[in-house]
């Protein structure tokens, strides 16, 4: 696709857009000045870019009908394996549909990408296949991942296996629902505000948001570079540890992972937690929307840790209450600029840029923007409003405040091995009807991140484990650890899991 020299009319229009007053002679001179840089673009078109590596042979699979998609959790079903032997031999894994699998359609929950088929595997997919895992399919997710509930996916509502009238959570709702329904033992999710932990909590499964920079997101569609995470969801703590072992570590592309420090996650499963100290985060229990019954289930689970030799005491981190405000300043403008205006791949980062995804996203933005969910429209318009009127000031300030938020948690974690709180202050909400008012559809998609989103900003690992039922719906306990200390969280999670059937707590 050669880059054409703009006409003098186009250059005049470009200048006017920036408030430039250009004479006819200046416009003509700028047209000539364009020729040198555009010659470089011409050469770029000729050069052959590297790819992510060879792709194993496979069938593209199929889109399942209602009979084999009871909860709407599948977008596409496959049976991809290489015959390799490793830590995931015999395991079936669902892949969140914001992660590329070569030859398999990908929507990322959005009409914008309908019909797109990537030609490459994301790093995490390659690692799963090399470890002997079988890719069972793509798990449905929320529209461009801009929802913490499960009613904005373009392929249909994703339902909670514990009560199909209730949300599975989001944005990795399909991943958690498939694990909860027993269709796969493990799945991959993404997390920018709680999108691994929310559905894991609401569906009663185990979900880990790793330390920022531990797991490469190469080949995954981003939202905002500074809060993007990819991590495991499993039916057990062992499933989470097993999958994390395979996907963690630098991949040569994602520069966020250069400093990644991996641990022996499988060995951590057998290490008793006796002697560890945990801080019970006061602010995590005190939101206006906190359900006392949820708080009680979480405190009972914490008591079971005491029986395993873990010391606990209450701790206060006042910054936790301002964390969601810092997160909002980062994610809203960041997503609008990087994802929506960056055509699904963003810019100014060191990493792999999937050109085919970028082109597909640009086509969708040009032809199907009115088909996106209300949450996507909100992010697009609000981000642009802040950009035009406040010139990125609040995004920049939020990025600076990130340091203070991180330090506040780190100060508490100097004394404690982990911080504990409810994952979500309440159980899964009812799925709004298709004709729900716009405000209801948006509010129920975005009202649950009070405890989760701050740790996307601070980058600390956060592990949710099921710890009880309230009116038949699961409750999650979230444990937050030091950077790259996922092993301690696995030790604590194993102790809670071993304490007995969480459904009877």
Predicted regions and their residues:
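Gly/Ser-rich catalytic/binding loops embedded in alpha/beta enzyme cores
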Residues: 21-192, 274, 299, 303, ...
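Short glycine/serine-rich loop segments
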Residues: 121-122, 126-251, 456-469, 473-476
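Amidase signature
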Residues: 1-88, 246-453, 457, 484, ...
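Short, well-ordered beta-strand elements within core beta-sheets of diverse protein domains
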Residues: 19-21, 75-76, 92-94, 112-117, ...
């Amino acid at each position: 696709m050669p880059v054409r020299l703009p006409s003098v009319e186009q250059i005049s229009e470009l200048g006017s857009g920036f408030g430039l007053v250009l004479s006819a002679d200046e416009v003509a001179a700028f047209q000539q000045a364009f020729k040198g840089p555009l010659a470089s673009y011409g050469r770029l078109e000729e050069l052959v870019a590297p790819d992510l590596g060879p792709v194993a042979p496979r069938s593209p699979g199929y889109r399942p009908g209602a009979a084999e998609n009871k909860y709407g959790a599948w977008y596409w079903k496959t049976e991809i394996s290489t015959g390799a032997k490793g830590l995931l031999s015999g395991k079936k894994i669902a892949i969140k549909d914001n992660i590329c699998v070569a030859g398999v359609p990908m929507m990322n929950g959005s009409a914008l990408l309908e019909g797109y088929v990537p030609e490459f595997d994301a790093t995490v997919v390659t690692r799963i296949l090399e470890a002997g895992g079988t890719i069972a399919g793509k798990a449905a997710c929320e529209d461009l991942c801009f929802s913490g509930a499960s009613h904005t996916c373009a392929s249909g509502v994703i339902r909670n296996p514990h009560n199909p009238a209730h949300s599975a959570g989001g944005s990795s709702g399909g991943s958690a629902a498939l694990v909860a329904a027993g269709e796969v033992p493990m799945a991959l999710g993404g997390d920018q505000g709680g999108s691994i932990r929310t559905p894991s909590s609401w569906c009663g499964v185990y979900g880990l948001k790793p330390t920022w920079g531990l797991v490469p997101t190469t080949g995954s569609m981003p939202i905002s570079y500074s809060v993007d995470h990819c991590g495991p969801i499993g039916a057990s703590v062992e499933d989470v540890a097993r999958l994390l072992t395979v996907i963690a570590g630098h991949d040569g592309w994602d520069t966020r992972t250069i400093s990644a420090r991996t641990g022996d996650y499988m060995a951590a499963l057998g290490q008793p937690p006796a002697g560890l100290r945990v801080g019970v985060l006061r602010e995590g229990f005190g939101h206006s929307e906190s359900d006392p019954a949820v708080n009680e289930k979480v405190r009972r689970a914490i008591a079971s840790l005491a029986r395993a030799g873990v010391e606990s005491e209450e701790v206060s981190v006042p910054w936790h209450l301002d964390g969601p405000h810092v997160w909002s300043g980062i994610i809203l403008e960041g997503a609008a600029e990087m994802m929506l205006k960056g055509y699904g791949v963003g810019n100014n980062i060191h990493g792999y840029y999937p050109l085919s995804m970028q082109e597909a996203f640009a086509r969708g933005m040009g032809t199907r923007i009115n088909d996106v969910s209300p949450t996507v429209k909100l992010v697009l318009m609000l981000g642009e409003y802040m950009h035009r009127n406040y010139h990125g000031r609040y995004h920049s300030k939020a990025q600076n405040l990130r340091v203070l938020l991180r330090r506040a948690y780190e100060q508490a974690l100097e004394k404690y091995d982990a911080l504990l709180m409810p994952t979500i202050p309440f159980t899964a909400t009812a799925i709004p009807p298709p004709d729900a008012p716009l405000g209801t559809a948006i509010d129920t998609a975005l009202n649950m991140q009070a405890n989760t989103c701050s740790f996307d900003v601070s980058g600390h690992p956060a592990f949710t484990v099921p710890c009880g039922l309230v009116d038949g719906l699961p409750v999650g306990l979230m444990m937050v650890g030091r950077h790259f200390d996922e092993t301690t969280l696995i030790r604590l999670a194993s102790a809670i899991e071993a304490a007995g059937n969480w459904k009877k707590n």
